[in-house]
Protein backbone atom coordinates (compact mmCIF):
# COMPACT_ATOMS: atom_id res chain seq x y z
CA UNK A 1 0.00 0.00 0.00
CA UNK A 2 1.04 3.59 -0.50
CA UNK A 3 3.02 5.18 2.26
CA UNK A 4 1.40 7.87 4.42
CA UNK A 5 2.36 11.47 3.68
CA UNK A 6 2.97 14.39 6.01
CA UNK A 7 0.27 17.09 6.10
CA UNK A 8 2.25 19.72 4.08
CA UNK A 9 3.30 17.07 1.56
CA UNK A 10 -0.27 15.80 1.30
CA UNK A 11 -1.49 19.31 0.51
CA UNK A 12 1.13 19.74 -2.19
CA UNK A 13 0.29 16.35 -3.68
CA UNK A 14 -3.42 17.13 -3.51
CA UNK A 15 -2.86 20.35 -5.47
CA UNK A 16 -0.75 18.45 -7.99
CA UNK A 17 -3.46 15.80 -8.31
CA UNK A 18 -5.99 18.50 -9.13
CA UNK A 19 -3.93 19.40 -12.19
CA UNK A 20 -3.48 15.85 -13.45
CA UNK A 21 -5.88 13.30 -12.02
CA UNK A 22 -9.20 15.12 -12.13
CA UNK A 23 -8.99 16.95 -15.46
CA UNK A 24 -11.12 14.51 -17.47
CA UNK A 25 -13.90 13.99 -14.95
CA UNK A 26 -13.68 17.65 -13.93
CA UNK A 27 -14.51 18.95 -17.41
CA UNK A 28 -17.52 16.65 -17.87
CA UNK A 29 -20.01 19.34 -16.67
CA UNK A 30 -19.25 21.19 -19.90
CA UNK A 31 -21.30 18.73 -21.95
CA UNK A 32 -23.08 16.10 -19.81
CA UNK A 33 -26.36 17.87 -19.02
CA UNK A 34 -26.49 19.35 -22.53
CA UNK A 35 -26.26 15.87 -24.06
CA UNK A 36 -28.76 14.29 -21.67
CA UNK A 37 -31.53 16.76 -22.42
CA UNK A 38 -30.52 18.14 -25.81
CA UNK A 39 -29.23 14.99 -27.44
CA UNK A 40 -32.08 12.74 -26.26
CA UNK A 41 -34.82 15.39 -26.52
CA UNK A 42 -35.90 14.61 -22.98
CA UNK A 43 -38.76 16.78 -21.74
CA UNK A 44 -37.71 19.38 -19.17
CA UNK A 45 -40.13 18.35 -16.44
CA UNK A 46 -39.26 18.44 -12.75
CA UNK A 47 -39.47 14.65 -12.50
CA UNK A 48 -37.07 14.20 -15.43
CA UNK A 49 -34.56 16.73 -14.11
CA UNK A 50 -34.63 15.18 -10.64
CA UNK A 51 -34.29 11.71 -12.14
CA UNK A 52 -31.24 12.65 -14.23
CA UNK A 53 -29.57 14.48 -11.36
CA UNK A 54 -30.15 11.47 -9.13
CA UNK A 55 -28.63 9.15 -11.76
CA UNK A 56 -25.56 11.38 -12.09
CA UNK A 57 -25.15 11.70 -8.32
CA UNK A 58 -25.39 7.97 -7.65
CA UNK A 59 -23.12 7.15 -10.59
CA UNK A 60 -20.51 9.42 -9.01
CA UNK A 61 -21.04 7.73 -5.65
CA UNK A 62 -21.19 4.07 -6.71
CA UNK A 63 -18.80 3.94 -9.67
CA UNK A 64 -16.24 6.64 -8.89
CA UNK A 65 -16.32 6.94 -5.10
CA UNK A 66 -17.07 3.37 -4.03
CA UNK A 67 -15.60 1.26 -6.80
CA UNK A 68 -12.53 3.25 -7.79
CA UNK A 69 -11.62 5.55 -4.89
CA UNK A 70 -12.44 3.23 -1.98
CA UNK A 71 -12.00 -0.29 -3.40
CA UNK A 72 -9.80 -0.48 -6.49
CA UNK A 73 -7.30 2.04 -5.14
CA UNK A 74 -6.47 -0.56 -2.47
CA UNK A 75 -4.92 -2.61 -5.28
CA UNK A 76 -1.59 -0.85 -5.65
CA UNK A 77 1.28 -2.63 -7.39
CA UNK A 78 4.34 -1.33 -5.52
CA UNK A 79 2.47 1.97 -5.22
CA UNK A 80 1.40 2.10 -8.88
CA UNK A 81 -2.11 1.88 -10.29
CA UNK A 82 -3.79 1.48 -13.67
CA UNK A 83 -5.15 -1.46 -15.57
CA UNK A 84 -1.72 -2.93 -16.39
CA UNK A 85 -0.63 -2.69 -12.75
CA UNK A 86 -3.89 -4.41 -11.77
CA UNK A 87 -3.29 -7.06 -14.42
CA UNK A 88 0.23 -7.68 -13.12
CA UNK A 89 -1.09 -8.14 -9.59
CA UNK A 90 -3.57 -10.77 -10.74
CA UNK A 91 -1.07 -12.50 -13.03
CA UNK A 92 1.68 -12.48 -10.45
CA UNK A 93 -0.18 -14.14 -7.59
CA UNK A 94 -3.14 -16.05 -8.97
CA UNK A 95 -2.50 -19.81 -9.48
CA UNK A 96 -4.00 -19.85 -12.97
CA UNK A 97 -3.88 -22.42 -15.73
CA UNK A 98 -2.25 -21.36 -18.97
CA UNK A 99 -5.55 -20.84 -20.81
CA UNK A 100 -7.07 -18.82 -17.96
CA UNK A 101 -3.87 -16.78 -17.75
CA UNK A 102 -4.08 -16.06 -21.48
CA UNK A 103 -7.72 -14.94 -21.18
CA UNK A 104 -6.95 -12.62 -18.28
CA UNK A 105 -3.88 -11.23 -20.02
CA UNK A 106 -5.97 -10.61 -23.14
CA UNK A 107 -8.61 -8.81 -21.06
CA UNK A 108 -5.99 -6.57 -19.49
CA UNK A 109 -4.40 -5.61 -22.79
CA UNK A 110 -7.83 -5.13 -24.35
CA UNK A 111 -8.46 -2.60 -21.59
CA UNK A 112 -5.17 -0.88 -22.39
CA UNK A 113 -6.14 -0.84 -26.08
CA UNK A 114 -9.50 0.75 -25.26
CA UNK A 115 -7.61 3.48 -23.42
CA UNK A 116 -6.05 4.62 -26.69
CA UNK A 117 -9.49 5.03 -28.25
CA UNK A 118 -10.47 7.14 -25.27
CA UNK A 119 -7.22 9.12 -25.60
CA UNK A 120 -8.30 10.31 -29.02
CA UNK A 121 -11.82 11.37 -28.06
CA UNK A 122 -11.12 13.14 -24.74
CA UNK A 123 -9.03 16.02 -26.16
CA UNK A 124 -11.40 16.49 -29.09
CA UNK A 125 -14.68 16.60 -27.15
CA UNK A 126 -13.23 18.58 -24.24
CA UNK A 127 -11.66 21.40 -26.23
CA UNK A 128 -14.59 21.58 -28.66
CA UNK A 129 -17.11 21.85 -25.82
CA UNK A 130 -15.05 24.64 -24.24
CA UNK A 131 -14.73 26.86 -27.30
CA UNK A 132 -18.35 26.26 -28.31
CA UNK A 133 -19.23 28.61 -25.46
CA UNK A 134 -18.23 31.49 -27.73
CA UNK A 135 -21.38 30.88 -29.78
CA UNK A 136 -23.62 31.82 -26.87
CA UNK A 137 -22.47 35.42 -26.73
CA UNK A 138 -21.67 35.77 -30.43
CA UNK A 139 -23.43 33.30 -32.79
CA UNK A 140 -21.50 34.87 -35.67
CA UNK A 141 -18.37 33.16 -34.33
CA UNK A 142 -19.72 29.71 -35.25
CA UNK A 143 -17.52 29.35 -38.39
CA UNK A 144 -14.42 29.93 -36.27
CA UNK A 145 -15.13 27.23 -33.66
CA UNK A 146 -13.54 24.33 -35.56
CA UNK A 147 -10.40 26.23 -36.67
CA UNK A 148 -9.92 27.55 -33.14
CA UNK A 149 -10.32 24.10 -31.56
CA UNK A 150 -7.93 22.59 -34.11
CA UNK A 151 -5.39 25.33 -33.51
CA UNK A 152 -5.47 24.75 -29.75
CA UNK A 153 -5.14 20.98 -30.14
CA UNK A 154 -2.34 21.14 -32.72
CA UNK A 155 -0.49 23.59 -30.49
CA UNK A 156 -0.91 21.24 -27.54
CA UNK A 157 0.60 18.31 -29.43
CA UNK A 158 3.36 20.51 -30.88
CA UNK A 159 4.69 21.52 -27.45
CA UNK A 160 4.90 17.93 -26.19
CA UNK A 161 8.48 17.50 -27.41
CA UNK A 162 9.57 20.38 -25.18
CA UNK A 163 7.89 18.88 -22.13
CA UNK A 164 5.39 20.53 -19.83
CA UNK A 165 7.52 20.83 -16.70
CA UNK A 166 7.75 24.62 -17.03
CA UNK A 167 3.98 25.16 -17.22
CA UNK A 168 2.93 22.05 -15.32
CA UNK A 169 3.21 23.87 -11.98
CA UNK A 170 0.31 26.07 -13.13
CA UNK A 171 -2.02 23.13 -13.74
CA UNK A 172 -2.91 22.62 -10.08
CA UNK A 173 -3.81 26.27 -9.34
CA UNK A 174 -5.81 26.56 -12.58
CA UNK A 175 -7.84 23.44 -11.78
CA UNK A 176 -8.27 24.67 -8.20
CA UNK A 177 -9.86 27.80 -9.63
CA UNK A 178 -11.90 25.71 -12.08
CA UNK A 179 -13.48 23.51 -9.41
CA UNK A 180 -14.07 26.52 -7.15
CA UNK A 181 -15.92 28.27 -9.98
CA UNK A 182 -17.92 25.09 -10.67
CA UNK A 183 -19.05 25.07 -7.06
CA UNK A 184 -19.89 28.79 -6.90
CA UNK A 185 -21.91 28.78 -10.14
CA UNK A 186 -23.73 25.64 -9.08
CA UNK A 187 -24.59 27.07 -5.68
CA UNK A 188 -26.02 30.20 -7.31
CA UNK A 189 -28.20 28.01 -9.52
CA UNK A 190 -29.40 25.85 -6.63
CA UNK A 191 -30.35 28.95 -4.64
CA UNK A 192 -32.83 29.84 -7.37
CA UNK A 193 -34.48 26.41 -7.37
CA UNK A 194 -33.51 24.46 -4.21
CA UNK A 195 -36.04 21.71 -4.97
CA UNK A 196 -33.32 19.97 -7.01
CA UNK A 197 -31.62 18.86 -3.77
CA UNK A 198 -34.33 16.20 -3.52
CA UNK A 199 -32.40 14.36 -6.27
CA UNK A 200 -29.91 13.22 -3.63
CA UNK A 201 -32.47 10.52 -2.83
CA UNK A 202 -32.14 7.45 -5.10
CA UNK A 203 -35.93 7.13 -5.33
CA UNK A 204 -35.91 9.72 -8.13
CA UNK A 205 -33.51 7.61 -10.21
CA UNK A 206 -35.70 4.55 -9.67
CA UNK A 207 -38.87 6.44 -10.59
CA UNK A 208 -37.16 7.74 -13.73
CA UNK A 209 -36.51 4.17 -14.92
CA UNK A 210 -40.02 3.06 -14.02
CA UNK A 211 -41.51 5.95 -16.00
CA UNK A 212 -39.33 5.80 -19.10
CA UNK A 213 -38.47 2.10 -19.35
CA UNK A 214 -36.17 1.35 -22.28
CA UNK A 215 -35.79 5.02 -23.17
CA UNK A 216 -34.64 5.69 -19.61
CA UNK A 217 -32.08 2.91 -19.88
CA UNK A 218 -30.69 4.36 -23.12
CA UNK A 219 -30.19 7.75 -21.47
CA UNK A 220 -27.49 6.08 -19.35
CA UNK A 221 -25.38 6.44 -22.50
CA UNK A 222 -25.32 10.19 -21.85
CA UNK A 223 -25.27 9.99 -18.04
CA UNK A 224 -21.99 8.06 -18.26
CA UNK A 225 -20.34 11.23 -19.58
CA UNK A 226 -20.37 12.45 -15.97
CA UNK A 227 -18.03 9.65 -14.85
CA UNK A 228 -15.59 9.43 -17.75
CA UNK A 229 -12.15 9.86 -16.27
CA UNK A 230 -12.87 7.70 -13.22
CA UNK A 231 -10.12 5.25 -14.17
CA UNK A 232 -7.59 8.11 -14.13
CA UNK A 233 -7.95 8.35 -10.35
CA UNK A 234 -6.55 4.82 -10.09
CA UNK A 235 -4.09 5.09 -12.97
CA UNK A 236 -2.35 8.16 -11.50
CA UNK A 237 -2.19 6.78 -7.98
CA UNK A 238 1.55 6.17 -8.27
CA UNK A 239 2.27 9.84 -8.91
CA UNK A 240 0.34 11.30 -5.99
CA UNK A 241 -0.54 8.51 -3.57
CA UNK A 242 -3.85 7.14 -2.34
CA UNK A 243 -4.43 9.57 0.52
CA UNK A 244 -4.06 12.86 -1.43
CA UNK A 245 -6.33 11.60 -4.21
CA UNK A 246 -9.01 10.42 -1.80
CA UNK A 247 -8.90 13.63 0.24
CA UNK A 248 -9.09 15.78 -2.88
CA UNK A 249 -11.95 13.76 -4.34
CA UNK A 250 -14.19 13.64 -1.28
CA UNK A 251 -13.21 17.02 0.12
CA UNK A 252 -13.27 19.20 -2.97
CA UNK A 253 -13.81 17.67 -6.41
CA UNK A 254 -16.91 15.55 -5.72
CA UNK A 255 -18.78 18.37 -3.91
CA UNK A 256 -17.91 20.85 -6.68
CA UNK A 257 -19.13 18.49 -9.40
CA UNK A 258 -22.37 17.59 -7.61
CA UNK A 259 -23.18 21.22 -6.82
CA UNK A 260 -22.52 22.26 -10.43
CA UNK A 261 -24.67 19.49 -11.92
CA UNK A 262 -27.48 20.34 -9.51
CA UNK A 263 -27.08 24.03 -10.35
CA UNK A 264 -27.46 23.22 -14.05
CA UNK A 265 -30.57 21.19 -13.23
CA UNK A 266 -32.04 24.11 -11.29
CA UNK A 267 -31.32 26.42 -14.23
CA UNK A 268 -33.11 24.08 -16.65
CA UNK A 269 -36.20 24.09 -14.44
CA UNK A 270 -36.17 27.88 -14.21
CA UNK A 271 -35.16 28.58 -17.83
CA UNK A 272 -35.85 25.66 -20.23
CA UNK A 273 -34.23 27.63 -23.08
CA UNK A 274 -30.86 27.14 -21.34
CA UNK A 275 -30.84 23.54 -22.63
CA UNK A 276 -28.72 24.70 -25.60
CA UNK A 277 -25.76 25.01 -23.20
CA UNK A 278 -26.71 24.89 -19.51
CA UNK A 279 -23.09 25.03 -18.33
CA UNK A 280 -22.26 28.41 -19.84
CA UNK A 281 -25.72 29.86 -19.31
CA UNK A 282 -25.33 29.15 -15.60
CA UNK A 283 -22.75 31.96 -15.53
CA UNK A 284 -23.70 35.66 -15.56
CA UNK A 285 -23.54 37.35 -18.98
CA UNK A 286 -20.45 39.36 -18.03
CA UNK A 287 -18.58 36.18 -17.06
CA UNK A 288 -19.14 34.30 -20.34
CA UNK A 289 -15.83 35.04 -22.03
CA UNK A 290 -13.73 34.60 -18.87
CA UNK A 291 -15.52 31.26 -18.41
CA UNK A 292 -14.68 30.24 -21.97
CA UNK A 293 -11.03 31.08 -21.31
CA UNK A 294 -11.00 29.17 -18.02
CA UNK A 295 -12.84 26.19 -19.54
CA UNK A 296 -10.40 26.10 -22.45
CA UNK A 297 -7.46 26.07 -20.03
CA UNK A 298 -9.12 23.29 -18.01
CA UNK A 299 -9.78 21.16 -21.10
CA UNK A 300 -6.21 21.65 -22.32
CA UNK A 301 -4.99 20.44 -18.92
CA UNK A 302 -7.36 17.47 -19.09
CA UNK A 303 -6.10 16.68 -22.59
CA UNK A 304 -2.49 16.95 -21.42
CA UNK A 305 -3.16 14.38 -18.71
CA UNK A 306 -4.60 11.98 -21.30
CA UNK A 307 -1.66 12.49 -23.67
CA UNK A 308 0.85 11.90 -20.86
CA UNK A 309 -1.14 8.81 -19.90
CA UNK A 310 -0.87 7.52 -23.47
CA UNK A 311 2.91 7.96 -23.36
CA UNK A 312 3.08 6.12 -20.04
CA UNK A 313 0.88 3.19 -21.15
CA UNK A 314 2.88 2.89 -24.38
CA UNK A 315 6.15 2.63 -22.48
CA UNK A 316 4.59 0.00 -20.23
CA UNK A 317 3.42 -2.23 -23.10
CA UNK A 318 6.79 -1.85 -24.85
CA UNK A 319 8.69 -2.91 -21.74
CA UNK A 320 6.26 -5.77 -21.10
CA UNK A 321 7.13 -7.09 -24.56
CA UNK A 322 3.81 -6.39 -26.28
CA UNK A 323 4.88 -3.60 -28.63
CA UNK A 324 7.98 -2.84 -30.70
CA UNK A 325 10.65 -0.54 -29.34
CA UNK A 326 9.83 3.12 -29.87
CA UNK A 327 11.91 6.28 -29.54
CA UNK A 328 11.31 7.51 -25.99
CA UNK A 329 12.69 10.92 -25.06
CA UNK A 330 12.89 12.33 -21.57
CA UNK A 331 11.65 15.90 -21.26
CA UNK A 332 12.76 16.50 -17.67
CA UNK A 333 16.17 16.11 -16.07
CA UNK A 334 14.59 15.45 -12.67
CA UNK A 335 11.30 13.60 -13.31
CA UNK A 336 11.87 10.22 -14.97
CA UNK A 337 8.14 9.83 -15.64
CA UNK A 338 7.99 12.85 -17.96
CA UNK A 339 8.56 11.33 -21.37
CA UNK A 340 7.77 12.08 -24.99
CA UNK A 341 7.15 9.44 -27.66
CA UNK A 342 7.08 11.11 -31.10
CA UNK A 343 5.24 8.30 -32.90
CA UNK A 344 2.45 8.18 -30.32
CA UNK A 345 2.21 11.97 -30.12
CA UNK A 346 1.72 12.56 -33.83
CA UNK A 347 -0.52 9.53 -34.28
CA UNK A 348 -2.77 10.93 -31.56
CA UNK A 349 -2.59 14.40 -33.12
CA UNK A 350 -3.69 13.07 -36.51
CA UNK A 351 -6.48 11.03 -34.95
CA UNK A 352 -7.78 13.94 -32.87
CA UNK A 353 -7.72 16.27 -35.88
CA UNK A 354 -9.69 13.74 -37.95
CA UNK A 355 -12.23 13.41 -35.14
CA UNK A 356 -12.74 17.16 -34.89
CA UNK A 357 -13.12 17.53 -38.65
CA UNK A 358 -15.29 14.45 -38.99
CA UNK A 359 -17.71 14.97 -36.10
CA UNK A 360 -17.75 18.79 -36.21
CA UNK A 361 -19.23 19.34 -32.72
CA UNK A 362 -19.03 18.07 -29.15
CA UNK A 363 -22.64 16.83 -29.41
CA UNK A 364 -21.76 14.60 -32.35
CA UNK A 365 -18.63 13.38 -30.57
CA UNK A 366 -20.68 12.45 -27.50
CA UNK A 367 -22.06 9.52 -29.52
CA UNK A 368 -18.52 8.14 -29.85
CA UNK A 369 -17.65 8.76 -26.22
CA UNK A 370 -18.46 6.23 -23.54
CA UNK A 371 -18.22 2.82 -25.19
CA UNK A 372 -14.47 2.48 -24.59
CA UNK A 373 -14.75 3.91 -21.07
CA UNK A 374 -17.55 1.56 -20.00
CA UNK A 375 -15.82 -1.48 -21.49
CA UNK A 376 -12.74 -0.58 -19.44
CA UNK A 377 -14.94 -0.26 -16.35
CA UNK A 378 -16.19 -3.82 -16.87
CA UNK A 379 -12.68 -5.22 -17.43
CA UNK A 380 -11.47 -3.50 -14.26
CA UNK A 381 -14.32 -5.14 -12.33
CA UNK A 382 -13.44 -8.63 -13.61
CA UNK A 383 -9.79 -8.17 -12.65
CA UNK A 384 -10.82 -6.71 -9.30
CA UNK A 385 -13.02 -9.73 -8.55
CA UNK A 386 -10.10 -12.08 -9.22
CA UNK A 387 -7.85 -9.96 -7.02
CA UNK A 388 -10.38 -9.92 -4.18
CA UNK A 389 -10.81 -13.69 -4.27
CA UNK A 390 -7.21 -14.80 -4.77
CA UNK A 391 -4.92 -12.02 -3.56
CA UNK A 392 -7.01 -10.48 -0.78
CA UNK A 393 -8.40 -13.86 0.33
CA UNK A 394 -11.95 -12.57 0.64
CA UNK A 395 -14.69 -15.14 0.89
CA UNK A 396 -16.78 -16.16 -2.08
CA UNK A 397 -19.91 -14.36 -0.86
CA UNK A 398 -18.45 -10.84 -0.42
CA UNK A 399 -16.54 -11.20 -3.69
CA UNK A 400 -19.68 -12.18 -5.57
CA UNK A 401 -21.71 -9.37 -4.00
CA UNK A 402 -19.13 -6.72 -4.89
CA UNK A 403 -18.56 -8.12 -8.39
CA UNK A 404 -22.31 -8.37 -9.05
CA UNK A 405 -22.93 -4.78 -7.93
CA UNK A 406 -20.09 -3.25 -9.91
CA UNK A 407 -20.55 -5.42 -13.00
CA UNK A 408 -24.29 -4.68 -13.11
CA UNK A 409 -23.52 -0.97 -13.18
CA UNK A 410 -20.72 -1.37 -15.72
CA UNK A 411 -22.76 -3.53 -18.09
CA UNK A 412 -25.77 -1.22 -17.81
CA UNK A 413 -23.64 1.73 -18.91
CA UNK A 414 -21.94 -0.39 -21.58
CA UNK A 415 -25.26 -1.63 -22.95
CA UNK A 416 -26.66 1.89 -23.15
CA UNK A 417 -23.57 3.00 -25.06
CA UNK A 418 -23.59 -0.03 -27.36
CA UNK A 419 -26.64 1.31 -29.20
CA UNK A 420 -24.52 4.35 -30.14
CA UNK A 421 -21.99 2.22 -32.05
CA UNK A 422 -23.47 3.09 -35.50
CA UNK A 423 -23.52 6.80 -34.60
CA UNK A 424 -19.83 7.01 -33.72
CA UNK A 425 -19.19 4.45 -31.01
CA UNK A 426 -17.53 2.32 -33.66
CA UNK A 427 -14.53 4.65 -33.75
CA UNK A 428 -12.92 3.88 -30.35
CA UNK A 429 -13.73 0.19 -30.87
CA UNK A 430 -11.90 0.16 -34.20
CA UNK A 431 -8.93 1.91 -32.56
CA UNK A 432 -8.96 -0.65 -29.73
CA UNK A 433 -9.10 -3.59 -32.17
CA UNK A 434 -6.18 -2.19 -34.18
CA UNK A 435 -4.07 -1.58 -31.06
CA UNK A 436 -4.95 -4.98 -29.57
CA UNK A 437 -4.03 -6.71 -32.84
CA UNK A 438 -0.68 -4.94 -32.83
CA UNK A 439 -0.01 -5.96 -29.22
CA UNK A 440 -0.83 -9.65 -29.58
CA UNK A 441 0.86 -9.91 -32.99
CA UNK A 442 4.08 -8.41 -31.67
CA UNK A 443 4.05 -10.69 -28.62
CA UNK A 444 3.42 -13.81 -30.71
CA UNK A 445 6.00 -12.75 -33.27
CA UNK A 446 8.68 -12.27 -30.62
CA UNK A 447 7.87 -15.72 -29.23
CA UNK A 448 8.38 -17.23 -32.70
CA UNK A 449 11.62 -15.30 -33.23
CA UNK A 450 12.86 -16.42 -29.81
CA UNK A 451 12.12 -20.05 -30.66
CA UNK A 452 13.90 -19.75 -34.02
CA UNK A 453 16.97 -18.16 -32.43
CA UNK A 454 17.05 -20.85 -29.76
CA UNK A 455 16.95 -23.56 -32.45
CA UNK A 456 19.86 -21.98 -34.31
CA UNK A 457 21.82 -21.12 -31.21
CA UNK A 458 24.39 -22.93 -29.10
CA UNK A 459 24.05 -23.56 -25.36
CA UNK A 460 26.33 -21.41 -23.21
CA UNK A 461 28.05 -24.17 -21.25
CA UNK A 462 29.46 -26.11 -24.26
CA UNK A 463 30.53 -22.82 -25.83
CA UNK A 464 32.59 -21.80 -22.79
CA UNK A 465 34.12 -25.30 -22.67
CA UNK A 466 35.11 -24.96 -26.33
CA UNK A 467 36.95 -21.73 -25.51
CA UNK A 468 39.03 -23.65 -22.99
CA UNK A 469 39.74 -26.49 -25.43
CA UNK A 470 40.43 -24.27 -28.44
CA UNK A 471 41.24 -20.78 -27.17
CA UNK A 472 40.85 -18.09 -29.85
CA UNK A 473 43.03 -15.01 -30.14
CA UNK A 474 42.03 -12.36 -27.59
CA UNK A 475 42.10 -8.59 -27.93
CA UNK A 476 41.88 -5.98 -25.21
CA UNK A 477 38.70 -4.35 -24.04
CA UNK A 478 35.17 -5.47 -23.25
CA UNK A 479 32.58 -6.78 -25.69
CA UNK A 480 28.92 -6.75 -24.67
CA UNK A 481 26.62 -9.05 -26.64
CA UNK A 482 22.91 -8.48 -26.05
CA UNK A 483 20.57 -11.45 -26.30
CA UNK A 484 16.96 -12.37 -25.61
CA UNK A 485 17.83 -16.03 -25.00
CA UNK A 486 19.27 -16.35 -21.48
CA UNK A 487 20.60 -19.87 -22.03
CA UNK A 488 22.08 -19.54 -25.51
CA UNK A 489 25.05 -17.90 -27.18
CA UNK A 490 24.08 -14.69 -29.01
CA UNK A 491 24.22 -14.99 -32.80
CA UNK A 492 26.29 -11.81 -32.92
CA UNK A 493 28.94 -13.50 -30.77
CA UNK A 494 29.03 -16.59 -32.98
CA UNK A 495 29.24 -14.47 -36.15
CA UNK A 496 31.99 -12.30 -34.70
CA UNK A 497 34.03 -15.33 -33.68
CA UNK A 498 33.42 -17.03 -37.03
CA UNK A 499 34.42 -14.09 -39.22
CA UNK A 500 36.97 -12.23 -37.11
CA UNK A 501 38.53 -15.24 -35.32
CA UNK A 502 39.04 -13.22 -32.13
CA UNK A 503 37.35 -12.55 -28.81
CA UNK A 504 37.71 -9.60 -26.52
CA UNK A 505 39.55 -10.01 -23.25
CA UNK A 506 36.26 -9.72 -21.42
CA UNK A 507 32.96 -10.91 -22.92
CA UNK A 508 29.62 -9.95 -21.38
CA UNK A 509 26.48 -11.77 -22.50
CA UNK A 510 23.73 -9.37 -21.55
CA UNK A 511 20.09 -10.34 -21.10
CA UNK A 512 17.48 -7.64 -20.35
CA UNK A 513 14.37 -8.86 -18.56
CA UNK A 514 11.18 -7.04 -17.62
CA UNK A 515 9.23 -8.09 -14.56
CA UNK A 516 5.53 -7.83 -13.73
CA UNK A 517 6.19 -5.00 -11.28
CA UNK A 518 6.37 -1.26 -11.97
CA UNK A 519 9.89 -0.80 -10.60
CA UNK A 520 12.81 -3.05 -9.71
CA UNK A 521 14.90 -1.89 -6.71
CA UNK A 522 18.50 -0.99 -7.51
CA UNK A 523 19.81 -3.82 -5.35
CA UNK A 524 17.91 -6.34 -7.49
CA UNK A 525 18.77 -4.75 -10.82
CA UNK A 526 21.74 -6.92 -11.77
CA UNK A 527 22.59 -10.60 -11.53
CA UNK A 528 26.09 -11.59 -12.65
CA UNK A 529 27.37 -15.10 -13.31
CA UNK A 530 31.05 -15.78 -14.06
CA UNK A 531 31.18 -18.52 -16.70
CA UNK A 532 34.97 -18.68 -16.96
CA UNK A 533 37.42 -17.81 -19.73
CA UNK A 534 36.62 -14.13 -19.27
CA UNK A 535 32.95 -14.67 -20.09
CA UNK A 536 30.23 -13.20 -17.87
CA UNK A 537 26.49 -13.64 -18.05
CA UNK A 538 24.71 -10.49 -16.85
CA UNK A 539 20.96 -10.18 -16.35
CA UNK A 540 19.56 -6.65 -16.07
CA UNK A 541 16.04 -6.46 -14.65
CA UNK A 542 13.58 -3.61 -15.15
CA UNK A 543 10.00 -3.01 -14.19
CA UNK A 544 7.46 -1.94 -16.77
CA UNK A 545 7.71 1.70 -15.62
CA UNK A 546 11.47 1.83 -15.07
CA UNK A 547 13.76 4.15 -17.00
CA UNK A 548 15.90 1.86 -19.19
CA UNK A 549 19.59 2.79 -19.37
CA UNK A 550 22.02 -0.06 -20.04
CA UNK A 551 25.32 1.89 -19.72
CA UNK A 552 24.16 3.25 -16.37
CA UNK A 553 23.20 -0.24 -15.18
CA UNK A 554 26.56 -1.70 -16.20
CA UNK A 555 28.42 1.17 -14.53
CA UNK A 556 26.78 0.09 -11.26
CA UNK A 557 27.68 -3.57 -11.79
CA UNK A 558 28.58 -5.12 -8.40
CA UNK A 559 30.79 -7.80 -9.91
CA UNK A 560 34.12 -6.05 -9.57
CA UNK A 561 34.21 -5.11 -13.26
CA UNK A 562 34.95 -1.47 -14.00
CA UNK A 563 33.20 -0.60 -17.24
CA UNK A 564 35.09 2.01 -19.23
CA UNK A 565 32.66 3.06 -21.96
CA UNK A 566 35.54 4.08 -24.24
CA UNK A 567 36.96 0.57 -23.93
CA UNK A 568 33.63 -1.24 -24.41
CA UNK A 569 31.95 -2.31 -27.65
CA UNK A 570 28.31 -3.36 -27.84
CA UNK A 571 27.48 -5.99 -30.46
CA UNK A 572 23.82 -5.97 -31.47
CA UNK A 573 21.94 -8.35 -33.74
CA UNK A 574 19.34 -7.07 -36.18
CA UNK A 575 17.19 -9.81 -37.66
CA UNK A 576 15.94 -9.47 -41.22
CA UNK A 577 12.60 -11.24 -40.88
CA UNK A 578 11.16 -13.20 -43.78
CA UNK A 579 7.45 -14.18 -43.55
CA UNK A 580 6.98 -17.95 -43.90
CA UNK A 581 3.65 -17.78 -45.76
CA UNK A 582 1.59 -18.80 -42.76
CA UNK A 583 3.75 -21.77 -41.75
CA UNK A 584 5.37 -20.06 -38.78
CA UNK A 585 2.50 -20.03 -36.30
CA UNK A 586 0.68 -16.90 -37.48
CA UNK A 587 -1.52 -16.04 -40.43
CA UNK A 588 0.29 -14.50 -43.39
CA UNK A 589 -1.07 -10.99 -42.82
CA UNK A 590 0.08 -11.11 -39.19
CA UNK A 591 3.55 -12.28 -40.27
CA UNK A 592 3.81 -9.31 -42.63
CA UNK A 593 2.49 -6.96 -39.93
CA UNK A 594 5.07 -8.26 -37.47
CA UNK A 595 7.91 -8.01 -40.01
CA UNK A 596 6.88 -4.42 -40.81
CA UNK A 597 6.82 -3.47 -37.13
CA UNK A 598 10.22 -5.09 -36.60
CA UNK A 599 11.75 -3.16 -39.52
CA UNK A 600 10.41 0.12 -38.17
CA UNK A 601 11.16 -0.47 -34.50
CA UNK A 602 13.60 1.87 -32.82
CA UNK A 603 17.17 0.69 -32.80
CA UNK A 604 18.25 -1.13 -29.62
CA UNK A 605 21.05 1.43 -29.48
CA UNK A 606 18.50 4.24 -29.13
CA UNK A 607 16.10 2.40 -26.86
CA UNK A 608 18.77 1.19 -24.43
CA UNK A 609 20.61 4.54 -24.56
CA UNK A 610 23.88 3.08 -25.80
CA UNK A 611 26.37 5.57 -27.31
CA UNK A 612 26.25 5.15 -31.13
CA UNK A 613 30.03 5.22 -31.46
CA UNK A 614 30.31 2.15 -29.22
CA UNK A 615 27.96 -0.07 -31.27
CA UNK A 616 28.55 -2.72 -33.93
CA UNK A 617 25.41 -4.13 -35.58
CA UNK A 618 25.41 -7.55 -37.21
CA UNK A 619 22.50 -8.65 -39.39
CA UNK A 620 20.98 -12.09 -39.82
CA UNK A 621 18.10 -13.43 -41.90
CA UNK A 622 15.41 -15.27 -40.01
CA UNK A 623 12.29 -16.94 -41.35
CA UNK A 624 9.19 -16.54 -39.19
UniProtKB/Swiss-Prot annotation:
Positions of transmembrane segments: 13-33, 52-72, 102-122, 139-159, 170-190, 208-228, 249-269, 291-311, 339-359, 368-388, 399-419, 421-441
Listed Pfam families: K_trans, K_trans_C
GO MF, one annotated term: symporter activity
InterPro entries: K+_transporter, K_trans_C, K_trans_N, Kup
Transmembrane among keywords: yes
Catalytic activity, as annotated: K(+)(in) + H(+)(in) = K(+)(out) + H(+)(out)
GO cellular component, one term: plasma membrane
Topology in the lipid bilayer: Multi-pass membrane protein
UniProt keyword annotations, A-Z: Cell inner membrane, Cell membrane, Ion transport, Membrane, Potassium, Potassium transport, Symport, Transmembrane, Transmembrane helix, Transport
Main location class: membrane
Subcellular location field: Cell inner membrane
Role, per record: Transport of potassium into the cell. Likely operates as a K(+):H(+) symporter.
Recorded family membership: Belongs to the HAK/KUP transporter (TC 2.A.72) family.
Protein name in UniProt: Probable potassium transport system protein Kup
